[in-house]
C-alpha cells in the first residue's frame, strides 16, 4: 500500500502493529489487535448480537453458533461504528454492514428506543425479535454495559443515548448529567450533552459523538489500545496515569495542554468519586500532528468509591488529593499552580453538585444517597 511506501510520514495506529508488509499476529493475550477492539461492541452490543443469532438459530432449527471476535467486529453497523475504520472485501468495494435498512434512527425515535431497551431487558426468554430489531443497528456499535443506541439529531450530528436499566440502583442518566455539568464548570473539555426523561424508570443521558465532524470520521483509539494493554489493566498490575502522561509526551499533538487537562481530570475524578476511570474510558483522537486527548466521557459518581481504577503514582490509587498534588510536576504544573487548580476544582464541585442535582429533578433522598461520592477537601 502507498502508506507503507511512505513510512517516513507514517504513524502507528496500534503499538502491536509494526509498519512493515506481511502477516502480523496478535499477542497471545489479545483476541484482536486493539485497533480493531476499539471498533467492537462491548457487553450491550454483544448481547444484542448473541440474541440475534439465537433467534436466527431457532428459525432455522439449529443450535446457535458461537460468535467470534470477527463476527462482533463486522456485525457493527458501518454508519455508527466508533472511529474512522471501515471495512470492505476489496479496494473500492462496498463497505460491510452498511445496509440502509439498519440506518441510525432519528432523534424522534428516542422514546421508542428506550421502551424497546426496557422491554428487551424484561423479556425473560430473550428472544423477542420485535425489540431486538429496534435496537440492533443503533445499539450494536457501542461499548459499555448499559443499554444504549446511536441516534441522529435534526442537524445530522450523531449522538449516543444511554437508557435507564432495570438494574439501576439510582437514576444513572441524571447523575451522569450532573457530573457532566460539573466537569464543564471546572473548565474540563467535555462534549455537548442533554438529558431526556421518557418514563418513571429513569432518565436518558445523551452525548454528542466527538469522533464525527459533519460527515467526516475522526479516528479514535482508547488508551488501552495505545498503551498496548488488555481489558482489565488497572492499578492492580501497576497501570497508572503516569503511563498515560508518558504517551502524551511522546505522541501528543498538544502535549502541554493535554497533560494539564489529564491532571485536572484526575482531580475531578477524585472530587466526584468516579472509580470507573479504566483505560477504555480514556481516549485519543488522531490529528495530522499526533494524538489529541479526547473529550472527557463516561464519568459517574460512586458513593461508596474510595479508589480509582488507575494508580495516580506508580503504586497508589487512593482517592486522596495529596497524591495527585505529588505528581503534578510530571504533568507540567508547578506546586503553586497545582494547589490552586485542585482547590478550585474541589470547591466548584462542592458548591454546585446539590444545586445541579435539584435542577435535574433528583429528590432529596437521591441527593443524600449520593452525598458520599462528593468528597470534601
Can you annotate each of these PLM segments?
Residues 1-279, 283-377:
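Phosphate/dinucleotide-binding and metal-coordinating scaffold of catalytic cores
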